[in-house]
């Protein structure tokens, strides 16, 4: 299969022997053949990178549709963020890699890597801007009206402030390690898609050192959205962001110093896997060697809250080897994906889609012996409209059949509860 981002038959250029796991594998360039149909003009092709973003426009449109139940709108918003994360990790990383290598030739669709990058960043910025406007102006107010609130620091009651303080010292303080940014401390390793805080300081630390800034990394074990217990919640479903708790108590991490600013940021890194296919004898071992490095690939995007000072944003860009075009300022949590947990914590069927009940193919509806049914002919199973139960039954019957010597499956993108 030839994509517009791969060398097109009939075009000149070397063909890589290095394949990307999860991406198009480019084979040897076809030999010259005078009988081959000449290449089609660019207008006959769609650019894969740009089309992926246009797909996310359609997903975002579902979140923007006011006929969609509020908690489902939140889910669609989270899906867009999750898709964009993967898009930057793989697709944008690939384009930036081409630019780094000096690739300038246009693809079959007539677009060169620099033009592709320019267009995709424009569309991505438009999507992100629409996301946060939608979150702040429609979805959060709609949820608040229904009794699902995300409380800001200024809205906390004295009882809630005390609960938050106890939560900070009990759950957060033991796992937070501030890292000073000075000549004695190199810029810390910031893992892919992790939540971090850039803290601006005044004064001297406990060792008498004059420190102007520090980084605080939030471990993944800490929940990004915390539900208030009923004893202190002011409503049926009150939540607080982890970022709000840290902002309220970040000074506890810097004794004797004055915190003048605390800003969340998040780095997206190149997460593609590279394997020299022709030289690898054991693919499993090769992947085991590559996987640990995915969290520390080249940075491709920096997300910061919109209150971060230009000086701090420029400093982070410089440390990460990024340009201003890679910076995305947002008015809200830098990782909307973590809001996906909220609908599961709220028992409000009136704010969700009615659960869908998948059916069974006619051939399996009354079947008592799956193997016997399959001997009569193939059965098409159309997920998610039809139940996954026949697959489980198939495995179960195979496991019990003495004539079955092995069961092998390809597992891809399983659910969290699989």
Predicted regions and their residues:
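N-terminal localization/anchoring segments of enzymes in phospholipid and broader phosphate metabolism
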Residues: 17-418
């Amino acid at each position: 299969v030839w994509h517009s981002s791969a060398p097109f038959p009939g075009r000149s250029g070397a063909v890589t022997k290095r394949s990307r796991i999860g991406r198009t594998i480019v084979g040897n360039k076809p030999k010259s053949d005078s009988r081959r149909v000449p290449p089609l003009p660019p207008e006959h092709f769609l650019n894969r990178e740009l089309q992926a973003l246009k797909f996310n426009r359609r997903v975002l449109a579902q979140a923007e549709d006011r006929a969609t139940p509020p908690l489902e709108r939140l889910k669609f918003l989270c899906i867009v963020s999750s898709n964009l994360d993967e898009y930057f990790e793989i697709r944008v990383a690939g384009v930036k890699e081409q630019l780094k290598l000096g690739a300038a030739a246009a693809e079959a669709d007539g677009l060169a890597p620099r033009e592709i990058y320019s267009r995709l960043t424009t569309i991505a910025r438009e999507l992100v801007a629409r996301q946060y406007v939608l979150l702040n102006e429609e979805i959060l107010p709609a949820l608040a009206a229904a009794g699902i609130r995300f409380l800001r620091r200024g809205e906390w009651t004295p009882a809630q402030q005390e609960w938050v303080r106890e939560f900070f010292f009990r759950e957060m303080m033991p796992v937070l390690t501030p890292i000073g940014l000075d000549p004695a401390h190199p810029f810390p390793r910031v893992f892919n898609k992790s939540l971090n805080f850039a803290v601006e300081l005044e004064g001297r630390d406990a060792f008498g050192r004059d420190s102007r800034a520090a980084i605080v990394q939030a471990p993944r074990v800490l929940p990004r959205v915390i539900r208030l217990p009923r004893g202190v919640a002011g409503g049926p479903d009150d939540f607080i962001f982890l970022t709000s708790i840290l902002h309220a108590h970040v000074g506890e991490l810097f004794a004797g110093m004055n915190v003048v600013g605390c800003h969340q940021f998040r780095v997206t890194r190149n997460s593609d896997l590279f394997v020299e296919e022709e030289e690898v004898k054991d693919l499993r071992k090769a992947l085991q060697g590559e996987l640990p490095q995915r969290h520390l690939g080249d940075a491709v995007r920096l997300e910061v809250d919109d209150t971060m000072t230009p000086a701090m944003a420029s400093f982070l860009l410089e440390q990460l080897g990024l340009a201003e075009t890679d910076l995305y300022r947002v008015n809200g949590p830098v990782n909307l994906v973590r809001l996906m947990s909220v609908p599961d914590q709220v028992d409000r069927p009136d704010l969700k889609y009615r659960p869908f009940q998948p059916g069974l193919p006619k051939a399996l509806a009354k079947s008592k012996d799956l193997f016997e049914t399959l001997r009569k002919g193939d059965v098409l199973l159309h997920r998610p409209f039809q139940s996954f139960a026949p697959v489980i039954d198939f495995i179960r019957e195979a496991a019990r059949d003495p004539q079955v010597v092995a069961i092998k499956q390809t597992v891809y993108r399983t659910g969290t509860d699989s």
